[in-house]
């Protein structure tokens, strides 16, 4: 009987740990963009953009100045210290695209400078985008 309880306990712990895994490592989930840091040393605070990463799917929720919301969709791939984001054509054609993205051809590859359970820092040509887990 004790042996059965021991195995049952091991199975329950394994199931619990598996259920807690998000399948995308530390990157999976919602991130709030907090700041841009530019190569010239200046910075810009941001609080109205949220990136979401989940099993290869990407979305960005952007709060508009008029109180509305717009969402951009795409895909991402994380390979080593680089993340590539490709937005769907419908998102690139959105009237707010240039305000929030403006990436040529709707795609960008960032260097991942920092990725932990609570912070994310992406770099592209000297510009850093700093996020916090939301």
Predicted regions mapped to residue ranges:
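Sec-dependent bacterial lipoprotein signal peptides
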Residues: 1-20
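Lipid interaction determinants
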Residues: 20-75, 79-134
């Amino acid at each position: 009987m004790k042996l059965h309880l021991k195995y049952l306990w091991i199975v329950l712990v394994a199931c619990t740990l598996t259920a807690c895994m998000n399948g995308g490592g530390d990157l999976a989930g919602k991130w709030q963009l907090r700041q841009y840091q530019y190569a010239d040393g200046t910075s810009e605070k941001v609080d109205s953009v949220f990136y979401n990463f989940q099993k290869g799917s990407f979305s960005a929720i952007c709060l508009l100045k008029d109180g509305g919301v717009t969402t951009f969709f795409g895909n991402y791939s994380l390979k080593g210290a680089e993340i590539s984001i490709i937005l769907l054509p419908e998102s690139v054609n959105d009237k707010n695209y240039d305000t929030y993205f403006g990436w040529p051809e709707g795609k960008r590859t960032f260097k991942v400078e920092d990725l932990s359970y609570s912070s994310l820092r992406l770099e592209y040509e000297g510009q850093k985008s700093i996020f916090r887990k939301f």
